[in-house]
Structures are given as structure tokens and as C-alpha cells.
Design a protein with these regions (language model features):
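Class I S-adenosyl-L-methionine
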Residues: 1-28, 62, 103-108, 121-124
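Short, well-ordered loop/turn elements at secondary-structure boundaries
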Residues: 48-50, 83-84, 126-128
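Short Cys/His-rich metal-coordination motifs, predominantly Zn2+-binding knuckles/fingers
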Residues: 56, 93, 128
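Short, charged surface segments at domain edges that flank catalytic/cofactor-binding sites
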Residues: 9-52, 76-80
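Short secondary-structure boundary micro-motifs
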Residues: 37, 42, 53-56, 63, ...
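A generic structural signal for short, solvent-exposed coil/turn residues
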Residues: 45, 59, 124-126
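Histidine-centered nuclease catalytic patch
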Residues: 55-88, 96-112
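Domain-exit/linker segments immediately C-terminal to small folded modules
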Residues: 96-147
């Protein structure tokens, strides 16, 4: 289970101001006035995850790490800066080929992020070991069972 980033009151005010502008999730994520917050998210998630990808648990190297939005920011702008929606991921797990813009939420949607139901094992809200068994075979892993 990954510990989420936390924001100061000042950071929350900056984020809320951007939400109120009505921009799309991808545009909010690129907002220049929030660059310091994105840098903080990157540092904190990397530290909290002990430099491991939130999904494949591969080792993360500086420069190859990306911030992953578990619920895609392009589908659900309201969760673009939601702390529980942000984790560090390796380039492979964060690639369009692997993740794309797939829906990860099960309807009906709840505006309170943690009260939603997810189609995936959520690295922040769930305990992955309760849902997935990893087998190390020739330096690769397989998901044996997903509940």
C-alpha cells in the first residue's frame, strides 16, 4: 500500500484556483503555476514508494519515472490533483500502450475519491498482497490471481 502525498493549505488553494478555471485534466496538469507542486508530488511519491513502481514494483531510476494518474485525468478532471490518485510509475507502466486512457472506475461515480469502486487493485487504497500473488520466475512476475 502506497502512502499518498499531502498538500499544504497554500498548495490546496493554488490547486483549487486552477480547478475553478474549468480547464481539462491534461491542461490542469500542465499548468505552469503548479510546477512546484508537481515536482513535490514526484519527490514525495518516489520517496513513499521507496523508488519502486506502484504497479510492477520495478526499480525506478531518476529521469525514467512518471507520475501516474490511476484514474485518468483525461476522463475525470476532478481527480487530476487528488493525492490518492497520484503514484510514481515506470515508463512502461505509464506508457500509452500499457495504460492508455482506460476507465478504472466502476459506476456509479462518487465525488469522494476513496468511496469509489475500482476495476483495478488500487496501489494506494488497497493492499496489493491481498489481491495478487507474485511469483518470481526468471526475473519476471505473473499475476496468479486477482480478486
Amino acid at each position: 500500500k502506497v502512502k499518498p502525498v499531502s498538500f499544504t493549505e497554500e498548495e490546496l488553494n493554488l490547486i483549487n484556483n486552477i480547478y475553478e478555471e474549468g480547464k481539462s485534466g491534461p491542461d490542469m496538469w500542465k499548468e505552469s503555476s503548479l510546477k512546484a507542486i508537481r515536482n513535490k508530488i514526484s519527490r514525495v511519491t518516489l520517496t513513499n514508494q521507496q523508488c519502486y513502481c506502484a504497479f510492477c514494483e520495478g526499480r525506478l531510476e531518476k529521469g525514467t519515472t512518471a507520475i501516474e494518474h490511476i484514474v485518468p485525468k483525461g476522463r475525470h478532471r476532478e481527480f487530476t490533483y487528488e493525492p490518492e490518485n497520484l503514484v510514481s510509475a515506470c515508463g512502461r507502466c505509464n506508457s500509452k500502450a500499457v495504460k492508455g486512457e482506460k476507465e478504472t472506475l466502476i459506476e456509479p461515480l462518487n465525488p469522494i475519491y476513496s468511496l469509489n469502486r475500482f476495476k483495478i487493485v488500487h496501489p494506494v487504497l488497497d493492499e496489493p498482497d491481498e489481491h495478487i500473488v507474485f511469483k518470481d520466475e526468471d526475473r519476471s512476475w505473473k499475476i496468479e490471481e486477482v480478486i
